Amino acid sequence: MTVTFKQRVTVIFICEDEMKTLLSSTQAGSLILTLNRPERANSFNFEMINELRNALTAAEADPQVRCVVITGGGKVFSAGQDITEMKQGEKISYREHLERTYNPLILQIRSMGKPVIAAVNGPCAGAAFGVALACDLRIARSTAYFVVGFSGIALAPDSGVSLFMPKYIGLGRAQEYYYSNKPITAKQALEWGMVNQVGGFNFDALVRQVAGELASGPREAFAAGKKAFNHAILPNLEDSLRYEGILQEEAGKTAEHHEGVSAFLAKRKPKF
């Protein structure tokens, strides 16, 4: 039996020269995709998610690309979903938003037949945490940290966090850090097995080294190995993403959530 993610999604192809929220470069068989919305702490909006999905689709089809690295521009990996866009943009349900954006992105990363590295150069929160956890490997800068984030605005975990996080660090720790919203340091994440390696001043060189090693490896075997791991560990990924959407739909209607968002935008502590 082989796990196949069945969700159908639409990808709108964008030429690399037209990308507004990503920077793209190649090196020794690796494609480096840099989240580039510095004015918004590299938070995700519809445009960035579409551009990232398009870039991954192109990388999958390009025989010259044998490994993909996702990182953040500047000192931040990503603050997660751009809350301002959700407040000001098209009025769709949270469930529909996930089905259009993060769910297909997470499934695409896991089903991609090439290794994907999250090079976590700085703070990583919310949906971006889910994106990083979906990648095959995580390399963190020593000053980076992870924040589950969702409970701060009275939401349930989404973007696969409810599935990935307990698998990496156990259910008790996952619930503790969801409830408390405390940061997980790079050092702690390494000790718990949530990240594979941590680099200080040598972070960039470490990422290049690991990406180069993967790019020079057996491509077809790596693709088969990833399928095997998906089958063994993540057979319920698609169902988990769907269920997260159901829960988020309900959480998004609560007075607690409205208070959480208002407090976030006003930069004050919420009163739940």
Where are these regions (language model features)?
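Short, charged, surface-exposed hinge/linker loops at domain edges
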Residues: 229-235
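Intrinsically disordered, low-complexity segments enriched in serine/proline and basic residues
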Residues: 1-5, 9-13
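Hydrophobic alpha-helical membrane-association signature
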Residues: 48-51, 98-101, 131, 244
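Glycine- (often His-adjacent) and acidic-residue-rich active-site loop
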Residues: 72-108, 124, 154
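Conserved CoA-thioester-binding segment of acyl-CoA-metabolizing enzymes
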Residues: 14-73, 107
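Crotonase-fold acyl-CoA enzyme core
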Residues: 107-222, 245, 250-254, 259-262, ...
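Short C-terminal tail/terminal secondary-structure segment
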Residues: 233, 269-272
